[in-house]
Swiss-Prot record:
Disulfide bonds: none annotated. GO terms for cellular component: cytoplasm. GO terms for biological process: L-histidine biosynthetic process. It is found in: Cytoplasm. GO terms for molecular function: imidazoleglycerol-phosphate dehydratase activity. This is Imidazoleglycerol-phosphate dehydratase. Its EC number is 4.2.1.19. PANTHER family: IMIDAZOLEGLYCEROL-PHOSPHATE DEHYDRATASE, IMIDAZOLEGLYCEROL-PHOSPHATE DEHYDRATASE HIS7. PROSITE patterns: IGP_DEHYDRATASE_1, IGP_DEHYDRATASE_2. Belongs to the imidazoleglycerol-phosphate dehydratase family.
Length: 197
């Protein structure tokens, strides 16, 4: 497993540079011009013990869609690459997180197959310039490019900010479990097939 990676993604719509360490301590720095997005990413980093340094410029004069989507694509690709053959990792992670009146569960499988499912209240409205519906776009593209199963269930809750924050915090916690090394099987691929994509 690689410890540090620095990758870039540049299109006619976005210019992104991401420094990522899955075996970090939760240190992060963001420069995206989208404050709410940075706030959500900080929860993945902090609770996943993932170091992230993200610089992003996008066509936010139109909206934030391309910026959020392309960040998810790059982050997902880097997670998949950094995990390598996935030898020794737990592979699975799940976390149920309470945040005041909200209760959210996130479950992941880093087994190499994409699936995304969200169950919960509609994510709509805006947080500054960030459209709330972009959270689902981010999660779907992250799962697709990391080649993982990602299930998100918001069991109940009302406050829109709490709902979003609980999703990203629980995602960080679930990823932390899944990428952790299983010391009882550190030289084994966590699959009866003997390999994972």
């Amino acid at each position: 497993m690689l410890r540090n990676m620095v990758e870039s993604r540049k299109t006619s719509e976005t210019d992104i540079r991401l420094d990522l360490n899955l075996r970090g301590s939760g240190v992060y720095a963001f420069d995206t011009e989208i404050p709410f997005f940075e706030h959500m990413l900080s929860h993945i980093a902090k609770h996943g013990l993932i170091d992230m340094d993200l610089k992003l410029r996008g066509d936010i004069g139109i909206d934030c869609h391309h910026s959020v989507e392309d960040t998810a694509i790059l982050l997902g690709q880097m997670i998949h690459t950094q995990l390598g053959d996935k030898k020794g990792i737990f592979r699975y992670g799940n976390f149920t997180l309470p945040m005041d009146e909200v209760l959210t569960t996130v479950a992941v499988d880093l087994g190499g197959r994409f699936y995304f499912k969200y169950t919960g209240p509609a994510l709509d409205g805006k947080f500054g310039i960030y459209d709330a519906e972009l959270t689902l776009e981010f999660l779907q593209k992250l799962a697709l490019n990391a080649k993982m199963n990602l299930h998100v269930v918001v069991h109940y809750g009302e406050n829109r900010h709490h709902i979003h924050e609980s999703i990203f915090k629980a995602l960080g916690k679930a990823l932390r479990q899944a990428i952790a090394i299983d010391t009882s099987a550190k030289d084994q691929i966590p699959s009866t097939k003997g390999m994972l994509e």
